[in-house]
Amino acid sequence: MSQSENKPPKTIASLGEFGLIDHLTRSIKIHHSSTIKGVGDDAAVLYDPNRQLLVTTDMLIEGVHFDLSYMPLKHLGYKSVMANLSDIYAMNGEATQITVSFAISNRFPLEAVEELYQGIKTAADLYQVDVVGGDTTSSTRGLIISITALGWAMPEKITYRNGANPNDLLVLTGDIGAAYLGLQVLEREKQVFQANPNNQPDLSDYTYLIERQLKPEARKDIVKLLADLEVVPNAMIDVSDGLSSEIMHLCKHSKVGCNLYEDKIPLDPQVIRTCEEFNLDSTTIALSGGEDYELLFALSQKDYAKIKGNPHLTVIGHFTEAREGIHIITREHTKIPLKAMGWNSFSE
């Protein structure tokens, strides 16, 4: 028997905190010159002489934000990165670095942590961001992930929530509602499996919805597209908590009103078909769903010609004076006050 066969398998306990960090981060690649020092010291060192630093943090908690009965750990790692990068792109910035912290209970073997981190590293490599630090600790209950994303932008290109003006166009990237419906499909199949473990789910009719829920993509491509079109939005936000909530955030911060047109909301055919199957209203799903990670922005009318006909961008409404309020115009041309219907972490 060889010496290697006599070695006990590595575990989280045998590695310890610092050994685990070394084990997980040994293959990390550095993509940016702004990363002066990454993993391995007391703090990362970042520097860019011309651009301003953008910082955002998101936390994901097992049982609140994800269910490991149908969320693969690799996908969870990937999605946790996307949620943070999306916020940087919503500021019209370039995401360049992340820090990764997690608390994990002793029910998870080392292989599970490796799978989680593989998803994080896959996202980091694909989106060209540097993992520059983080922390690990034990948890008495489940899994907690906290990622901080850092990015940079020229001061004149940074897009806040508070710049929308009356008569600006309301523009949405991609389509919405699919992530929420993907969650509904997975929850339904979970209940079916619990009732009959021998029942194997057939998810072939819901591939787009499930991918949008389990493995979303942040819209880095839109930031590049806007730069190529020489367009700087007046205000922007990512659609993580539902379209209606995000519109209301833009209006509140910009002190404007808005008219959203129901018939302009972009929906994938799979969303429409699944809403019919589940007896759900597709507009309600679009307004309240969340986790789409699309970008929603205010655009000056003078820039409309630059985006006209672009398949990635849809004009779904326009901003008004604040006194006119925030409304959705239905397909029947009825004007209805819009209410915030999105995700709330503190709802009971």
Give names to the regions the model predicted.
Residues 60, 96-189, 318:
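Glycine-rich anion-binding loops of enzyme active sites
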Residues 2-19, 23-29, 107-130, 140-145, ...:
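Glycine-/charge-enriched secondary-structure boundary and capping motifs
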